[in-house]
Amino acid sequence: MGAVSSGLVPDGRHFVSRARDEASSWRDVYKTPITTADLASRMGGYLQAYTLYSSVRPFGITAIIGGWDSEEELPVDGQVGSGPSIGSGGKVEGKKYGGPGLYMIEPSGLYWGYYGAATGKGRQVAKAELEKLDLAAGNLSLLEGVKEAARIIYVAHDDNKDKDFELEMTWISNLEGPTKGRHQEVPKDILEEAEKYAKKALEGEDDEEEAKDDDKPAEGDRMEE
């Protein structure tokens, strides 16, 4: 499971530290890893608490939490086969659970689940590009996702006319994938390939825009017509 934030850096570090404590506490009590949804719920409540009192200020971040939850039915009392059918109390035997999870948590503590999310500078451009991918269909492979994520980041930076930047990426696969369900940095060779793809795609978009501009009639031509 991984987390990223935009906004005040110290607040982001505290958010990650608290998330680690919540995950550790969950494992101590329930003897199983915390799910992405439960961690988002707990962290949303934690951020919301800082909006209730005048003695503390709200968090100055928007955070994204992503993870891959086990799809196996763990034989833990209160987790499988018994307990309520909804909420944190348990699962229903035979029903499928787990898989990928992605949540964005706002400073108010409000959080939502997404197929793809973006925050920070350039988020509107990134969101527009994410919508083009039809992530809900679930047809994007892990390697394709890395390439598209790199492309979107390059597009967002180019739109804002940002200076040169260093791209860092992490990923999470299922238990059969390259990360075995763990949150890890994308290997250097795959990251370099993704950056080449992103730069090539960006150059292609620039060429298309230049071609469209060349096809447009000049103002003088329009007046003569």
Please place each PLM-identified region on the residue numbering:
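Long, low-complexity N-terminal extensions
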Residues: 1-225
